[in-house]
Curated annotation (Swiss-Prot):
Record key words, sorted: Metal-binding, NADP, Oxidoreductase, Potassium
SMART domains hit by this protein: IMPDH (SM01240)
Coiled coil feature spans: none
Taxonomic path: Bacteria, Pseudomonadati, Pseudomonadota, Gammaproteobacteria, Enterobacterales
Sample GO molecular function, one term: metal ion binding
Residues forming the catalytic site: 186
The UniProt record lists the keyword Transmembrane: no
Organism: Buchnera aphidicola subsp. Acyrthosiphon pisum (strain APS)
Subunit-level organization: Homotetramer.
Enzyme Commission number(s): 1.7.1.7
Cellular component GO terms held in the UniProt record: cytosol; GMP reductase complex
Catalytic activity: IMP + NH4(+) + NADP(+) = GMP + NADPH + 2 H(+)
Function: Catalyzes the irreversible NADPH-dependent deamination of GMP to IMP. It functions in the conversion of nucleobase, nucleoside and nucleotide derivatives of G to A nucleotides, and in maintaining the intracellular balance of A and G nucleotides.
Annotated PROSITE patterns: IMP_DH_GMP_RED
Protein name (record): GMP reductase
């Protein structure tokens, strides 16, 4: 047993210090990024936000909406091959270029993804997704996928420490997904006592990844656009969103009406709801590590995306970053004990 004495930080623990700027308007800020990758020869350009590969968020409908903003969607792994086939046949090149195909680490997953990628050469991205990226099994599976798909852009996770980021990159990942327990409907930290505050995880993992010409995705913990700015400021190359995109018509799930108000169900992928839906039961050796919540229906996702992007542009303006790429080097974090004046929060409409 050992104790690390330095305090690790989450988004609520800091603010970004404003700096002198020559920008006259938020409209001058360019949020697009362009990345090359360690293994894949592909070049990616777009706004580096990703819809999470949760079954309620990473849907084909979400792909169609977010592709208009040049934003990626990590499509969840529970679609059948036939559903993939129908989607690919009916989708344009522009839409398919914004799809990340998510898989688990079983032999069935591997066989399925091989079939999916035969459907179109426009599919370029793979996300190997498990809750615990510290398993030797994900490393061996990653090597298998990299050998079979040498030209695809592969991300793998989730981890929260630099040494495992390095392990995954050296084993074939172009991008590593960072985050254990910060999600809005995740209870892993309280159920297991395991986790890492997200901002510190980003800072440490970005340093490890960039030293090997890799990238990271910050996965989880963002509740407002300011948190997304902090993630980019801390060194994240991409930011993955789940809860912030929930409750929209592009999400899967029924709309529930109660007392003339509409709601949607949103749940974590290790929750009772998810396990009962896909496995039929909770295995005797497992515990739920997720919540199920009922959230107000918010209509189409477009207005939410515009609000997020507007907040990001404003963040860049406050520190003088003309491009999102410049935000990290323009960011100075200050430790704080407060974030906002909450006096009227109870009166929000």
């Amino acid at each position: 047993m050992r104790i690390e004495e330095d305090i690790k930080l989450g988004f609520k623990d800091v603010l970004i210090r404003p700096k002198r700027s020559i920008l006259k308007s938020r409209s001058q800020v360019n949020l697009a990024r362009c990345f090359s990758f360690k293994y894949s020869a592909s070049i990616w350009s777009g706004i580096p936000i990703i819809a999470a590969n949760m079954d309620t968020i990473g849907t084909f409908e979400m792909v169609k909406s977010l592709s208009k903003f040049n934003i990626l969607t990590a499509v969840h792994k529970y679609y059948s091959f036939e559903e993939w086939k129908n989607f690919v046949c009916l989708s344009s090149k522009e839409i398919l270029n914004h799809v990340i195909v998510s898989i688990g680490t079983s032999n069935i997953d591997f066989l399925k993804i091989k079939k999916i990628f035969l459907l179109s050469s426009e599919l370029k991205y793979i996300c190997i997704d498990v809750a615990n990226g510290y398993s030797e099994h994900i490393v061996s599976f990653l090597k298998l996928v990299r050998d079979y798909f040498p030209d695809k852009i592969i991300c793998a996770g989730n981890v929260v420490t630099g040494e495992m980021v390095e392990e995954l990159i050296l084993s074939g990942a172009d991008i590593v997904k960072v985050g254990i327990g910060p999600g809005s409907v995740c209870t892993t930290r309280v159920k297991t006592g395991v986790g890492y505050p997200q901002l510190s995880a980003i800072i440490e993992c970005a340093d490890a990844a960039h030293g090997l010409n890799g990238q990271i995705i910050s996965d989880g913990g963002c509740t407002v656009s300011g948190d997304i700015a902090k993630a980019f400021g801390g060194g994240a190359d991409f930011v993955m969103l789940g809860g912030m995109l929930s409750g929209h018509k592009e999400c899967s799930g029924d709309i529930i009406e109660e007392k003339s108000k509409k709601y949607m169900i949103f749940y974590g992928m290790s929750s009772v709801s998810a396990m009962q839906r896909y496995e039929g039961k909770i295995a005797g050796y497992r515990a739920s590590e997720g919540k199920t919540v009922k959230i107000p229906f918010r209509g189409g996702v477009d207005s939410t995306i515009r609000d997020i992007l507007g907040g990001l542009r404003s963040s860049c303006t406050y520190v003088g970053a003309e491009k999102l790429k410049e935000l990290t080097k323009r960011t100075t974090f200050i430790r704080v004990t407060e974030q906002e004046n909450c006096i009227f929060n109870a009166f929000k409409e």
